Amino acid sequence: MTFLNPCHPRLALAIGLVLAPQISAAQVVSSPIAAGPSAAPLPKGPRAMMLADWYRVVSVGSPAVSPDGKRVAMTVTKAVAAENKRHSEIWVVNTAGGDPQRWTSPNTESSNPRWSPDGKYLFFTSPRGGGQGNTWAIRLDQPGGEAVQVATYPNGSMPLDGSFAVFTEPMARDSASGNGANPFARMQPMAKPPFEAITRPADPARFDGRHVTDMSYKVNGVGFVPGRAEARSWRPAQLWRQSVGDTAKRQLTTTGYSHRAAVVSPDGKWIAFVADARLRADSVVDAERDSLAKLPYDKVRDEADRNEADIYVVASTGGAPRKVADWMGTESDITWSPDGKQLAFVGRASRTKSARIYVVDMNGGTPRNLLGNWQYEPSSIDWLRTGAMQFVADIGGRSAVLRADLAGKAAPTELVGGRRQLRGASYDAAGKVMAFVATSMTKPTELFVANADGTAERQLTTFNASLNADVVWSDAERFTYKSVGDLEIEGWLMKPYGYTPGKKYPMVIYIHGGPHSSYGEGWFDEFQNLAAQGMYVLFTNPRGSSGYGADFTYSTRGRWGMEDYDDIMKAVDIVAARPDVDSTKMGATGGSYGGFMTTWIATKTNRFAAIQTDRTITDWTYWYGSSDAQGLTEFEFFGKPWDNQALYDTLSPIRYVQKVKTPMLLVQSEEDHRTPMGSAEIWFMSLKKQGVPVEMVRYPRSNHDLSRTGEPWLLVDRLGRIKQWFGYWLQGVKPGTAAH
């Protein structure tokens, strides 16, 4: 279950400056990040993946093409095994080719590069000390230099000439007037009594617990959140303007409503932004939302399309805003046409409808749908100086860069695609050079560049070359099949390392989280981990997955564990019938939604010899009360538990736990506030009481994202446990001998 937390308000960032380094050939580093002291060296290849290989994988992200198209900056990240951490740096490579160079200090964390419009500065995010904020810059026209604070280069949307920036942020909070000494000032934040709390500590010095009055008192990845210390107040995000070279910023608006996603026109005369459709104050919008949230589910009211927001334009010097169009739904990712006469945006008419690209005249009118009934959904838009409009989209389990037909009469044209996953398309100012990162089933991420039309593609980095030379990554065969309702489902079967024709192999099926996420044509450590152990790895995108259009994605509402279960088991049937698969030695694994589904499967069938469940959900009513994401089931299960208790109970695996016979390994994080520990605990105790083989591994200092961003040592330990569990039950490997 991969949920995204709501965006936090934008924070004002001071700007730091460090002069561009002069890097000699001797300073060009072939290995991107020093790994520090290591354990015994790994054997040379070609060979199967070992757990220690995980520490060698380099991740490349956030590509940014310089305005002149001559360079690409990127974030390069690798684990530092000796220190149990990840480390990120900014690297730069010429688009003409050559060795990439490190541009930031190896002693500090740096990420998310972006160029100034004039190409004189490369900005990046870094938590280095000695400054007033997290945004720093590298100056390209002077050698050497150290990080210094500079507040004269603003952060935000800029016109073509780069003379100023427009951004949104709340007004400064009024300083507290003070009402005498605060008797709770020395208490821990969570122990302090929130505003309007009825109870108070008998002795503030002797209470170190948690005092909760707000529903949002814990957030996955953040932890426990203290309650408000004062009456609720609103600080709407206003429009601001700051000239380059000037530290002063000018406030353009003073309204009760927030301005979002502000973008300035190419000529600098106009600002487009998203705001409430009726420009109601934030306090009014929140009061309405809070009131509706308390009501029982009502199909007519809750399933009706709503006009959540609209696009407005205002002069860049300030003034009254003008609505561009009344459009039902939500708008995001606004971008101006190169001539500044039109606006494009990604619009979604309702939560269960596919996102489309729309274009509207900046003076008003009816938005035009450029994608028609095209099955797939766009992500961010780039309207290039050449007039071409391009975007990235998931096409089932792969992704591609596409060009939209501005007339809206033809389907988008695929420019760059293939059996891989692409992310982060970036362009130069002229709209002629494109960079992106890509990964395939047998290759971790690297940086690529091409002409903006997709021609002349070439790979610019080889950070993972030595790893790829040592390890034989397993590839997967893509297949499709018809399931319930004649719906076509996409799946993949990864061959085991050292595959020999005529031999039978065990098989493990992976079930993804979300449920509105997907597997696909990218390198994945978990698949390679089990394939290296000599197992087939099966993975599919059952109904409910993303990448196939909104109808497919939301077809499982109120029916989790029903047709989606059939989709999964149909794939198992197909693979189990292969002569090289041992159908008596099959396993299943998954996390979050996949954790729910694996426990559900355990109650439905005994055909699997072993199951491993991660971040599981076994009782939906318990989950609703203990998770930080109640909105998920309020939407997916049509209301709160007391609105639809029968459905919550029917879809809870714990109601059928007496049917479970399959040995199970439970993996859970102590600080997971998305799928809390109680679901795993009740499942563990139930299986123990019934004599079913079960183990539970609880990881400290870890949250819902352990398998993605957790501490490296714990993440690798988890991979080893999964390998050992299936090695024991599917291959007869003795305990502890499959941990490398």
Would you name each region that the model predicts?
Residues 281, 500-505, 510-548:
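Short substrate-entry loop that stabilizes the transition state in hydrolases
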Residues 29-34, 87-88, 170-245, 277-312, ...:
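Predominantly five- to eight-bladed beta-propeller fold
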Residues 526, 532, 539-740:
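Active-site-proximal cap/loop segments of hydrolase catalytic domains
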Residues 78-82, 128-131, 172-175, 278-281, ...:
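Short glycine/acidic-enriched loop and turn motifs that connect beta-strands
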Residues 67-68, 117-118, 160-161, 266-267, ...:
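Residue-level detector of Asp-centered blade-edge/turn motifs that repeat once per structural unit
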Residues 69-72, 119-122, 165, 271, ...:
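Hydrophobic beta-strand positions that form the internal "hydrophobic ladder"
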Residues 33-59, 83-86, 92-111, 126-127, ...:
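Multi-bladed beta-propeller domains
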Residues 64, 166, 214-221, 225-227, ...:
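Non-catalytic accessory segments flanking enzyme active sites
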